[in-house]
Regions:
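Basic, Lys/Arg-enriched alpha-helical interface segments
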Residues: 1-59
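Short, P/G- and charge-enriched loop/turn segments at secondary-structure junctions
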Residues: 60-64
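Enriched for short, Lys/Arg-rich terminal
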Residues: 68-101
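Conserved strand-loop elements at the edges of beta-sheets that form or border functional pockets
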Residues: 9, 67-68
Length: 101
């Protein structure tokens, strides 16, 4: 079976960082909930890749963005499987993130 989405290496690190940051601040159960919510959101984006918005003020197309809870997901919907390139807290300054992937 072909995967529905893939995580770029920076997104894998982001996901891990978010998990451990939430665990440290709010405990394991909350961290697991946030992690599971992100994985469900990746699946949803794979089912409806056009759901996210282009945000040219952040990154040029083909990158799209989708917010879920405290996180903001940058991904490419123009490739299959879709490619999750970065994940950050919604309040994060995206200008420091270079779109790789």
């Amino acid at each position: 079976m072909t995967p529905r989405y893939e995580l770029a290496a920076p997104a894998e690190r982001d996901l891990e960082d978010i998990f451990f940051e939430v665990k440290e601040r709010h405990g394991l159960l909350v961290a697991e909930r946030v992690y599971d919510n992100l994985l469900r959101t990746f699946d949803l984006l794979a089912q409806m890749p056009e759901m996210g918005r282009h945000r040219p003020e952040l990154w040029p197309p083909p990158y799209r963005f989708w917010g879920t809870g405290p996180a903001f997901i940058a991904y490419r919907a123009d490739v299959r499987p879709i490619r999750i390139v970065r994940i950050a807290r919604a309040s994060h300054n995206w200008s420091g993130f270079a779109p790789r992937g």
